[in-house]
Amino acid sequence: MAKSYEYLHEFFEDVCNIEDRDKRIVFVKENAFKQAKTILQLCYNDKIKLDLPIGKPPYRPCPEGRTPSSLANAFKPIGMTVKGNKVRRLKKEKVFIGILESIHEDDANLLVAAKDGNITTFQKKKYSKITKSLVEAALPELLK
């Protein structure tokens, strides 16, 4: 039975806490939810890129004590920021900043890292076990 997650970073931390690669693959297959899959695609699918500058944009993290938006609601407009979308670049940046400001700060950092394709190297390699080969083995459809 799939585990339910309120935050993206909790899912990715759970994946990295599994030492055995085969068990990690099974865990990802059974527990990856839509927004986690979006992060994996942004990071490892060469056909899906966001039309945004590299690096962390200027934004205000979701304040302590305020409940972040649900991931499902927060991620709805992310398609507007994809390369090839006819939305103006400034609007894409505003949409992306809006997403970052509405989610948990750790999830926002994860999303920025995925956008830049460096999920395995940011935050002192916290998510180094989430590699392209892991995604290929667990969810190959995300890379097609």
Give the positions of each predicted feature:
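N-terminal nucleic-acid-engaging modules of covalent nucleotidyltransferase systems
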Residues: 1-144
